[in-house]
UniProtKB/Swiss-Prot annotation:
Pfam families per record: KH_1, PNPase, RNase_PH, S1
Keyword Metal-binding set for record: yes
Matching NCBIfam families: polynuc_phos, pppGpp_PNP, PRK11824.1
Family: Belongs to the polyribonucleotide nucleotidyltransferase family.
Name the record gives this protein: Polyribonucleotide nucleotidyltransferase
Subcellular location per the Swiss-Prot or TrEMBL entry: Cytoplasm
Length: 756
């Protein structure tokens, strides 16, 4: 990597650059520019990835704080502009509308490391808007957006302890290097050869340059869709040790990005403004609450059951607030915040000193587990997974591949065959609230569960279905997203989906503090909701028994020692193995498909025969659909997906398609049960096979007697037994009727096709 530098390219326009060296994979250049665009924003930075990818980030702040808020009002928005890819939006109004899933997930990637970097108690509204203005189709913009948002916030004069650097690193393997190399800012083509892909964000806490100490703040990682094929070919599996190596590999890249942002800020940043902060409580309030509540609250926190513990804690809170409130009139909000802080302190102390948790478990214990399948009668697949008080219902629906989601975004993905939707109704925590369209959190949790399962899904050739998986969080007390992974694995197997391996997930936590003069770290397996809120880390790991398929980490600490992280990963694997064993007791192989699920078969026809299968204005394919009741979808490569509610209907449609695409000429003397498709003055045209008609002359219709009109004997739609009398040089077929009772030789294939 070359040294970072900042230059004034024009009057008041500054630019800094970070060059990322990927060795044999080349270099990537990230350039930050400020002073040219969006000059009325508090801070505005344009970030470039090489020459063609360009994002504008603008950070603004309200002039007055929202004193009545008890949270930090930070909003992050990502605006995908279709002109960035030279496209017109596909919506009815041909204008960008609601944000895409990619944009929402990028908002979350930005928010998670930025939010804890602001000073505690800030109540001014802060908005960061990132606009994607140009995008090379080989680039993924999300990590560029993290850096752009951090840079614009760093120069905005806000109480912000950045900069924050974000990088995507992928473990890319090749024929010459099966162990792989961690490559920063990989292209879409390079990701095709990767086994693992992770977005890592962090900041420099001490040092500089190659000696910088980088604290990891956020990780979003996944195994690639083709990881199992790569492993079978000899590639390195993304085990816990490999994932830990990837996190270390990301740190020098993050340091370089932070240095470039800091260099830009040294020339262009505004002085930090005078922003008032509103501490949750003053020291005198905490001291009074601690003196009044410690003993009773400690006792309440030993109750194992969540509902009973919460009820007792609320009871203690009411008693204590009534006791101390007269001394703090008008400061009731502080009392509530102090009580919460005391609860956090006591929970953490108990874990650190006694290795004991609020529900009575040890630090590595998993709550009671339960798994059951076939819960919903008419669903194609369903399962109920319970871990303690967390209860997830997974439901699988199968349909034709044409029902795959069409994606209109700037990402490389245009369709999604596997769709994972996560719902978190308010009753899951015993509360009331809004229901309806999903919130960002629900979209993020669904995406995490989706990424965990994608590597083990069968290919469309192996299983020609679109799959919708819904996770219903019926009860929540810790990691419903990882519960969704477990419930989804069970439901998919119940639906008959041939997964390459079952996947389970677990949420890990971490508590750290000074104990007897040294920093002590305790990793927690299967954290509760309270341990998530009061702990220092939320670390979700999903995978098979052999490797990690998805990982998500958020931490409040300025760095986690490598050995602590490795220990947490090892604990997570042990827990995952235990959960997989419980799941296997419920179901360990794919069930028979539900009778309510469609039967979908994929066949191939020559590309030059696609037009014949469709027919003029869709006449032929519509006729097959009407006769058999099957749904038919034809791809440009000649793949035909045939779906029906039962096997015979699907087979009848397949036979009719094959008769057109791969025809076998009938022979003289063959007999058929045909259908009259047209009558003329000289005879009746009879359909023998799809696309193959013959003529019964009027002179042959009267059983030796002369008839005036064809319609006196048959009409369109009539069934008639016929025999091929002649096939001329042009392939035209002449037919003669066959007397009923003398039709034993009638072609059985024709009988079957006609009877459908």
């Amino acid at each position: 990597m070359t040294e970072n530098s900042v230059v004034e390219v024009d009057e008041g326009v500054f630019e800094s650059t970070a060059v990322i060296d990927n060795g044999s994979f080349g270099t990537r250049t990230i350039r930050f520019e400020t002073g040219r665009l969006a000059q009325q924003a508090a801070g505005a930075v344009v970030a470039y990835l090489d020459d063609e990818t360009m994002l504008l980030s603008a950070t603004s702040a309200s002039k007055h704080p929202k004193e009545h808020f008890d949270f930090f009002p930070l909003t992050v928005d990502v605006e995908e502009r279709m002109y960035a890819a030279g496209r017109i939006p596909g919506s009815f109004f041909r204008r960008e509308g609601r944000p895409s899933t990619d944009a929402i997930l990028t908002c979350r990637l930005i928010d998670r490391p930025l939010r804890p970097s602001f000073v505690d108690g800030l109540r001014n509204e802060i908005q960061v808007v990132v606009t994607v203005m140009s995008l090379n189709p080989q680039d993924l913009y999300d990590v560029v957006a993290i850096n752009a948002a951090s840079a614009s916030t760093q120069i905005a004069g806000l109480p912000f302890s950045g900069p924050v650097g974000g990088v995507r690193v992928a473990l890319i393997v090749s024929e010459d290097n099966k162990a792989g190399q961690w490559v920063a800012f990989p292209t879409v083509d390079q990701l095709e050869n990767a086994v693992f892909d992770m977005v890592v964000a962090g900041r420099v806490v001490s040092g500089s340059g190659d000696n910088a100490d980088v604290a990891i703040m956020m990780v979003e990682a996944e195994a690639t869709d083709n990881v199992i094929a790569k492993i079978a070919d000899g590639a390195q599996a993304p085990t816990e040790a490999i994932v830990a190596e990837g996190l270390e590999a990301a740190k020098p890249f993050i340091a370089r990005l932070c240095a470039a942002q800091a260099a830009l800020a040294s020339k262009a940043a505004k002085p930090t403004g005078d922003y008032p902060v509103f501490p949750a409580y003053q020291d005198d309030v905490f001291a009074a609450v601690e003196a009044a509540a410690s003993e009773k609250l400690n006792a309440a926190l030993t109750i194992a059951g969540k509902q009973e513990r919460d009820d007792k804690t609320d009871e203690v809170k009411v008693e204590v607030l009534e006791q101390v409130a007269p001394n703090f009139e008008g400061r009731e909000k502080e009392l509530g915040a102090a009580f919460r802080s005391l609860t956090k302190k006591l929970v953490r102390q108990r874990i650190l000193r006694d290795q004991f948790r609020i529900d009575g478990r040890g630090v590595t214990d998993i709550r009671s587990l339960s798994a059951e399948v076939a819960i919903i009668p008419r669903a194609h697949g369903s399962a109920l997974f319970e871990r303690g008080e967390t209860q997830i219902l997974g439901v699988t629906t199968l349909d034709m591949v044409k029902m795959a989601q069409q994606v209109d975004s700037l990402g490389p993905e245009t369709t999604k065959r596997y769709m994972h939707h996560y719902n978190f109704p308010p009753y899951s925590t015993g509360e009331t609230g809004r229901v309806g369209s999903p919130k960002r959190r629900e979209i993020g949790h669904g995406a995490l569960a989706e990424r965990a399962l994608m590597p083990v899904l069968p290919s469309v050739e192996e299983f020609p279905y679109a799959i919708r998986q819904v996770s219903e969080a019926l009860s929540s007390n810790g990691s419903t997203s990882m519960g969704s992974v477990c419930a989804s694995t069970l439901a998919l197997l119940n639906a008959g989906v041939p997964l390459r391996a079952p996947v389970a997930g677990i949420a890990m936590g971490l508590v750290s503090d000074q104990v007897d003069g040294e920093t002590r770290y305790v990793a927690l397996t299967d954290i509760l909701g309270a341990e998530d809120a009061f702990g220092d880390m939320d670390f979700k790991v999903a995978g098979t028994k052999d490797f990690v398929t998805a990982l998500q980490l958020d931490t409040k600490l300025d760095g986690i020692p490598s050995q602590v992280l490795a220990g947490a990963l090892s604990q997570a694997k042990d827990a995952r193995t235990t959960i997989l064993e419980v799941m296997a007791e419920a179901i360990d192989t794919p069930d028979e498909m539900s009778p309510f699920a469609p039967r979908v078969t994929a066949i191939k026809v020559p590309v030059d025969k696609i037009g014949e299968v469709i027919g003029p204005k869709g006449k032929m394919i519509n006729s097959i659909t009407e006769q058999t009741g099957a749904n038919i979808s034809i791809e440009d490569d000649g793949t035909v997906f045939v779906g029906a509610t039962d096997g015979p209907s699907a087979q009848a449609a397949i036979d009719m398609i094959n008769a057109i695409a791969n025809p076998q000429l009938p022979k003289v003397g063959e007999r058929f049960l045909g259908t009259v498709v047209k009558t003329t003055a000289f005879g009746a045209f009879v359909s023998l096979l799809p696309g193959r008609d013959g003529l019964v002359h009027i002179s042959k219709l009267g059983s030796g007697k002369r008839i005036a009109k064809v319609e006196d004997v048959v009409n369109v739609g009539s069934k008639i037994r016929v025999e091929i009398a002649d096939i001329d040089a042009r392939g035209k077929i002449s037919l003669i009727p066959v007397e009923e009772g003398n039709d034993e030789a009638a072609a059985p294939a024709a009988d079957e096709a006609a009877s459908e």
